[in-house]
A protein has these predicted regions:
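Sec/Tat signal peptide C-region and signal peptidase I cleavage site
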Residues: 16-20
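Short, surface-exposed coil-to-beta transition loops
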Residues: 21, 45-48, 116-125, 150
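Signature of long, low-cysteine stretches enriched in small and polar/charged residues
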Residues: 88-128
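Short conserved aromatic/hydrophobic patches within beta-strands of well-structured domains
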Residues: 23-40, 161
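Mid-chain, structured segments of secreted extracytoplasmic proteins
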Residues: 62-105
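Secretory pathway targeting signatures of secreted, lumenal, and periplasmic proteins
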Residues: 32-72
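Surface-exposed amphipathic alpha-helical segments
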Residues: 136-182
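Sec-dependent N-terminal signal peptides
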Residues: 4-15
Length: 182
């Protein structure tokens, strides 16, 4: 009887993992109204953008972008290096500082200057290993003074963004955090 119970339990747990979907929870500042400006899932990639209320996906001063790359097996350091190379190609004025680097998670701070038609911005960029691949989380701000003034708050928000597997599509968070399917 114990073997049947054990087998049934293992089967149930493995079945639940198949039907789970990866989500992310981001807790935005309490007194700021951030809204979803863009979400698209195509194949193995999903991208989500949040902006302050009244701004849009192409017209923003601050933005949080989450991009998931399901089944991506790159080492975090390689993914970060490739991302930085793309940024430098688009805007060679970029400077960055590695703030945290482990095998499964990295955070860098970086700023650019105006370059051609590209407006200057500063960002906190996190690359993390999820359950199903790699997830990047960007906080971007086009106002360097505001970025520096609120740096610690946003560093902690991005650092504390949490990935987890959800088993119910109508699951609700008990706090004010935002979440979406990756």
């Amino acid at each position: 009887m114990k073997k049947v119970l054990l087998f049934s339990s293992l089967f149930l747990l493995s079945t639940l993992m198949v039907f789970a979907y990866e989500t992310i929870i981001i807790k935005f500042p309490d007194r700021e109204n951030w809204v979803k400006a863009y979400y698209k899932k195509v194949g193995l990639e999903a991208i989500l953008q949040y902006v302050p209320a009244g701004q849009g996906s192409n017209n923003w001063t601050k933005s949080v972008v989450v991009h998931s790359y399901n089944q991506s097996t790159y080492p975090i350091s390689v993914f970060l290096t490739n991302s930085t190379a793309k940024l430098l190609k688009a805007n060679p004025t970029a400077g960055y500082k590695t703030l945290r680097l482990t095998d499964n998670d990295a955070i860098v701070g970086r700023c650019t200057k105006n370059y051609g038609k590209i407006q200057a911005q500063c960002e906190i960029f996190r690359v993390t290993r999820g359950y199903e691949g790699i997830v990047t989380i960007h906080y971007m701000n086009k106002d360097k003074d505001d970025f520096m003034e609120n740096y610690n708050q946003w560093y902690n928000i991005i650092k504390r963004a949490k990935l987890y597997n959800s088993y119910y599509r109508d699951e609700r968070m008990l706090d004010k955090a935002e979440y979406f399917e990756l």
